């Protein structure tokens, strides 16, 4: 649903997303449309690569937030942790925390780092409480 709403916004305006008071050029709007087309196709890896080429933090964070909100993705514990730490005002933070907790792999992440995370962040899922 979120993807559809953002897509509608992008398709119905010539100036979308502002960064440092510089509006997107028509070329960047077209690139952004292309990114959302890739997302609709489920091609997240290409969408994320194209996002980096536009070089706009707002758009990059938005696309990455949409990606992280998907239950099935290739993000790991650190991807979630870094995003949540750097983007404290983004919506759906409890759900991102929930997904982060399900990405904990004790074979890849040291006990110390897991303990440190939960000292700073209260678990939101039973899975997180077990860790």
Residue ranges and their predicted role:
Residues 18-131:
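Alpha-helical solenoid repeat scaffolds
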Residues 1-19:
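Classical Sec-dependent N-terminal signal peptides that target proteins to the secretory pathway
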